[in-house]
Amino acid sequence: TVYTVGDSAGWKVPFFGDVDYDWKWASNKTFHIGDVLVFKYDRRFHNVDKVTQKNYQSCNDTTPIASYNTGBBRINLKTVGQKYYICGVPKHCDLGQKVHINVTVRS
């Protein structure tokens, strides 16, 4: 399954609760190995950093596991477990531009 993060809103700083990546977007989806996350955004203003849980919680992007900046990033989910993504532009993560998912094996 291909999932566009934020659906039609895409990957952006949430304004007035228009997007809630964890509670409204990710919480009602089941992610499996083989699925694809698509981050759509204006690369002049945003990016995507895969980070650890600790860095997700503190919005620290100084040591990302991986970085993406095409504006149309396709991330293949290849391993099980918790995955954490933030926007590395200053203050964007603090304002809610972050998402975490749990990848499981398809039964």
From Swiss-Prot:
GO terms for molecular function: electron transfer activity; metal ion binding. Keywords: Copper, Disulfide bond, Electron transport, Glycoprotein, Metal-binding, Transport. It comes from the Eukaryota. CDD domains: Mavicyanin. Cu cation binds at residues 46, 87, 92, 97. SUPFAM superfamilies: Cupredoxins. The keyword Metal-binding applies. The keyword Zinc does not apply. GO terms for cellular component: plasma membrane. Residues 1-105 form the Phytocyanin domain. Gene3D superfamilies: Cupredoxins - blue copper proteins. Glycans are attached at residues 28, 60, 102. Disulfide bonds join 59-93. PANTHER family: BLUE COPPER PROTEIN (PTHR33021), OS07G0570600 PROTEIN (PTHR33021:SF339). This is Stellacyanin. It comes from Toxicodendron vernicifluum (Japanese lacquer tree). The lineage of its organism: Eukaryota, Viridiplantae, Streptophyta, Embryophyta, Tracheophyta.
